Amino acid sequence: MNIDWPCFGRTDFLNFFSERHDSVTLFSHADYELRKSDSFLAALYSVLENQQFDFCFSYNFFPLMATVCHKCNIKYISFVYDSPQVKLYSYTVTYPTNYIFLFDSSLVTQFQKEGLSRFYYMPLPVNADRIHSLLQKPYDSARLSADVSFVGSLYNENHNLYDSLQGISSYTKGYLDAIMQAQSHVYGYNFLEECLTPAITAELQNAAHYQKNPDGVESLSFIFSDYYLCRKLT
């Protein structure tokens, strides 16, 4: 079974399952991203109890789905393409029914060092056949060809959380700008979270009013470094 939501790669993965002659049941629910929903739990329980599945699959990890799969003793395979992904700090990642694949090998190592054995490394997949077929069609090669290209979001269009912070002191603003500037000159090591002192973190929390998830163990310093500073730095 595959949880159905408007994710990147949805069509490609469904084509992959079809080529393998796998029988796929799509499950969708408005509360799929929530951390608590009796409605989601009941709906998914009903599907899993009345049909037989080898495993459940989703792009990105969803704690509610992990909870139901654990309860029903069904393998839950998730491939996470969003980074950072705060849902990975839910206690539900510890369930033995999970198979969580990340494209960030250093993050896999980090989780495994903490004793979380349900994390595995896998590069981002691509549907080469579909891309090949697209290249057979006419396109503006001069405009769309390059030695190096970047496809993705710089987070300046949406989700620029850093610029939304209101009420932080000029000292804190200068401090944060300085550590981001320093980080921009360092490749291969992220030290931003280490630079967030308890006092700075408390001031950011007073400005952002971030509500921690009841099933999560993520620290405020992680939230502010990865979701606010790293996105701005990108």
Regions inferred by a protein language model and the residue ranges of each:
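Histidine-centered beta-alpha loop that forms part of the nucleotide-sugar donor binding/catalytic region
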Residues: 60-61, 80-83, 105, 123-126, ...
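A short, active-site helix/loop in glycosyltransferases that binds the activated sugar's phosphate group
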Residues: 100-117
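N-terminal pre-catalytic "stem/leader" segment of glycosyltransferase-like enzymes
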Residues: 1-73, 222-228
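Short, charged, surface-exposed secondary-structure boundary motifs
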Residues: 35-37, 85-92, 110-114, 130-135
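Nucleotide-sugar donor-binding catalytic core of glycosyltransferases
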Residues: 1-9, 117-118, 123-234
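Short, structured coil segments at secondary-structure junctions
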Residues: 20, 72-73, 95-96, 114-117
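Active-site proximal beta-strand in glycosyltransferases
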Residues: 69-84, 99-102
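A conserved, positively charged/aromatic
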Residues: 89-101
